[in-house]
Amino acid sequence: MGIAEVALHSMPGAFAAHSPASNLPLAADAARGRRRRSANSLHSSRALQGPVRFPGLRAAVECQCQRIDDLARVTEGNGAWVKDAVDKASHALGDVRVPGQAVGGNGSVNGSAAKPPPQRRKASSVEDEAWELLRESVVYYCGSPVGTIAANDPNDANPMNYDQVFIRDFIPSGIAFLLKGEYEIVRNFILHTLQLQSWEKTMDCHSPGQGLMPASFKVRTIPLDGDEDATEEVLDPDFGEAAIGRVAPVDSGLWWIILLRAYGKCSGDLTVQERIDVQTGIKMILKLCLADGFDMFPTLLVTDGSCMIDRRMGIHGHPLEIQALFYSALLCAREMLTPEDGSADLIRALNNRLIALSFHIREYYWVDMQKLNEIYRYKTEEYSYDAVNKFNIYPDQVSPWLVEWIPPKGGYFIGNLQPAHMDFRFFSLGNLWSIVSSLATTHQSHAILDLIESKWSDLVAEMPLKICYPALENQEWKIITGSDPKNTPWSYHNGGSWPTLLWQLTVASIKMNRPEIAAKAVEVAERRIAIDKWPEYYDTKRARFIGKQSRLYQTWSIAGYLVAKQLLDKPDAARILSNDEDSEILNALSTNRKRGKKVLKKTFIV
């Protein structure tokens, strides 16, 4: 069955889950829900902040989600709307029912969708406390767990958007639950976010590609029109329309594919990834990423703020983090796609991109002492097909800090590569996920870990792990960040230390059979992370202070620690996240290197 024949839920508004009082069609109700939000009732709900309860409401009006059986419209990767002949697509989300709570409202915890944070009791250990906090952060939709909010500080009167379920933030939470044997929340998250993928998303009359996954979503509880005693819960996604800078989240779809594969490998339940709607969702993401454009490089071209670093930090272009996630998602998707006639061209394009991307990153992004010396001696302005300095990099770009910082043993992938520009900053997530996904060779993977060990006082210090190194300072900070007061030197994304990166470090270390690196980092974190109330990030060069604007009880700081502990206890479980080096790619790369450049006849340019 081709992509155009598959039923995908799509509607112009928030998905409404109705009380028994409502018998209207689902799509009509959802559209009405969207109009109501923009017209009146939800304007006031947006202003609500902090936990709000409606005693007895949930007992009187039990939310009963309708199964998504009536969904008839589907969107293809090219944005065309197609009618499906299937009367009942049984790929529904409403088949899971677990009593619970829900968090709702943009910037607020809304209505019966939430209960006040319980009094925190002192746990018997750091790990016990982390599990307690993680479970408190769970969000429920119609009685079923669907994700975790970004931060759950009971003393925070202004949570902004930290009470939303962010796709990237939920990944370590989802992995923690998978490793614990609690699969339902991950399954629900995967399927509910899939339904959000095809919803209408516009900003200033422009719509992005149909495969885009949201950055986050909220569960709202709102009253039903015409019935004062009935309520409905709606999922309200944000595709970047409300984000700072209004940037679409490129990494959301890539993380979704990675989590989907991890769910299947950990739970053994392959029926989810084999569902027609899930297969279609994978294809839509791939079509969006593999679409032809003007770029000559196999890397994904993105704007600033499209990934974990979601503010202006000079990573526009081809940032390493996106390329590593892209490569990993391509491998995961190829593993999960079911063979069918309509997928042949997509699989072919996927394989070609894997080979080109692997070669490009390994060859041009890699720096160690030897490569740095080559760049230092580059000739410039080379006009030829066999130029050594293909991107016309000027040797003066090699910063003095790097000459002193690069160790004799070790290396890393630079942060970005564009014509006449190499971003030599070390970005932790991109390098670690290059190891996990086998985008880095075995030699390069060990060299990255060697560098982390060698530069432990810079990258780990008193709290793992620097998101990037070094920080932008002085005039460079003013020009590149726009004088961003949140990204001051050695703070937030500009050289801040993020505890959530513990789990990526652990997966990478275990994959290379060097778990002692992760164990040492976990030991450093345990000294103070619970005492400091699980901050989002740390400031200063050695991570001595809690970040100036750091949220406390940050969920992915909690989950990142838990995943690291779980994987160190059961190292074999790291296989649900890692990719083995692909023999076909290795053969293709070795063939390309042996073949070299063909000697061309003399040509004349007219």
UniProtKB/Swiss-Prot annotation:
Entry's Gene Ontology molecular function annotations: endo-alpha-N-acetylgalactosaminidase activity; sucrose alpha-glucosidase activity
Enzyme class name: hydrolase
Transit peptide: 1-58
Known catalytic reactions: Hydrolysis of terminal non-reducing beta-D-fructofuranoside residues in beta-D-fructofuranosides
Entry keyword Transmembrane helix: no
Subcellular location: Plastid, Chloroplast
Region (Disordered): 97-126
Claim: Coiled coil is one of the keywords in the record: no
GO biological process, one term: sucrose catabolic process
Keyword vocabulary terms for this entry: Carbohydrate metabolism, Chloroplast, Glycosidase, Hydrolase, Plastid, Transit peptide
UniProt-listed SUPFAM superfamilies: Six-hairpin glycosidases
Any GO CC annotation of this UniProt entry: chloroplast
This enzyme's EC code(s): 3.2.1.26
PANTHER family given in the database record: NEUTRAL_ALKALINE INVERTASE 3, CHLOROPLASTIC (PTHR31916:SF28), PTHR31916
Family: Belongs to the glycosyl hydrolase 100 family.
Function: Mitochondrial invertase that cleaves sucrose into glucose and fructose.
Official protein name in the record: Neutral/alkaline invertase 3, chloroplastic
Annotated organism of origin: Oryza sativa subsp. japonica
